[in-house]
Amino acid sequence: MRKADLVVGVQWGDEGKGKIVDMLGLNYDMICRSQGGHNAGHTIWVDGVRYALHLVPSGILHKNIINIIGNGVVVSPEVLITEMAQFDNLEGRLYISDKAHLNLSYHSQVDQAKERLKGEKAIGTTGKGIGPTYADKISRSGHRVGELLEPERLCDALMHDFETNKPVFDALGVKIPEENELLEELKRYKEVLAPFIANTTNLVWKALDEDKKVLLEGAQGTLLDIDHGTYPYVTSSNTISAGACTGLGLNPKEIGKVIGVIKAYTTRVGHGPFPTEDKGTNGDKMCEIGKEFGTTTGRRRRCGWFDAVSVKYASRLDGVDTYALMKLDVLDGFEVVKICKAYQYNGETIDYVPTDLENATPIYEELAGWDSVKGISRYEDLPANARAYIERIEELTGVKVGYISTSPERSDTIIR
């Protein structure tokens, strides 16, 4: 039986997973999304055209690939329908798990209200209602995509939920829809989405049993994992490679090659510890050149130097076999580039990620910069200093770099 390969982000998300999945997708029969919701965003450039995807897997740009939204994803029908409208002839190419949980408008209202109440202690969520949706799932009070096939029954269940939660909703200022409006909305969702709702676990199993090539597409990044990330400044799902198993119904033996996606520098959206953040001109330069604004929220990403300590930690959690190094071109023209090789922590030098990362100070190694890597298609033709930078990352993390992106375009990728 063939195993499924996995692409996973190894930093705080926004590493460039979409480009890698889109590039590798031509070699696969099926591409699967396993967790997260429309708080995640993949940006793909093809022939100068920008595609921003939030729920639909990146393989949708390839006509012969089956795309799966797995049970671990939380699905906003409204967002999904809007996103699907960008593409033609999706039947037979896109399937949504009937076990995936529904993210509805009241979830985002709850999310935003709670963030406002936290004031300065706000986590900095996207406000898309992802956390409240997963909270409903864990408390066994959520609703699943398969329930859209019976809109009247789902409407009754939701109205009962609204009544039960009315004191909380009133306190938070959540607007509860009228029953007739809700029913019409659910009927519309059914009309559009019914042909795509399926038992996706069986579809993935069948593909593997038939020796089809399957690629799993992670969302966000390992350092945002609900258990192993910088809690509480994390997302609400398991973003590590093991999350792909629970989010699709696979066992660990069915995971093959793990490709860890890393950016040549580091970015983070929202609040939370970020040891290598550069709040000066270098960070501003990375943001400007790298166009570091969120695909989902448009928020400016915090930027800083490459952190080999956190990447090594995340790579161990994910079982990374090889790296895809993205946005190397953004560092073009820097006279000096830095890599964090250790932390100063409570008076000691450490080479691991402590639970309270906010108390860690980076210890940097400085390397000489380079002029430009744009348009280079062979590793040997990269500037010597760029190669030295890549090879030092490999030495510090213990993982080889197999792919190097030198521009947003699909074609500008070096394969070693």
From Swiss-Prot:
Pathway: Purine metabolism; AMP biosynthesis via de novo pathway; AMP from IMP: step 1/2. Its main location: cytoplasm. Its cofactor is Mg(2+). It is found in: Cytoplasm. It comes from the Bacteria. GO terms for biological process: 'de novo' AMP biosynthetic process; IMP metabolic process. One of its GO terms (cellular component) is cytoplasm. IMP binds at residues 14-17, 39-42, 126, 140, 220, 235, 299. It catalyses: IMP + L-aspartate + GTP = N(6)-(1,2-dicarboxyethyl)-AMP + GDP + phosphate + 2 H(+). The active site is at residues 14, 42. Gene3D superfamilies: Adenylosuccinate Synthetase, subunit A, domain 1 (3.40.440.10), Adenylosuccinate Synthetase, subunit A, domain 2 (1.10.300.10), Adenylosuccinate Synthetase, subunit A, domain 3 (3.90.170.10). It is an enzyme of class 6 (ligase). Binds 1 Mg(2+) ion per subunit. PANTHER family: ADENYLOSUCCINATE SYNTHETASE. HAMAP family: Adenylosucc_synth. Belongs to the adenylosuccinate synthetase family. This is Adenylosuccinate synthetase. It comes from Campylobacter concisus (strain 13826). The gene is purA.
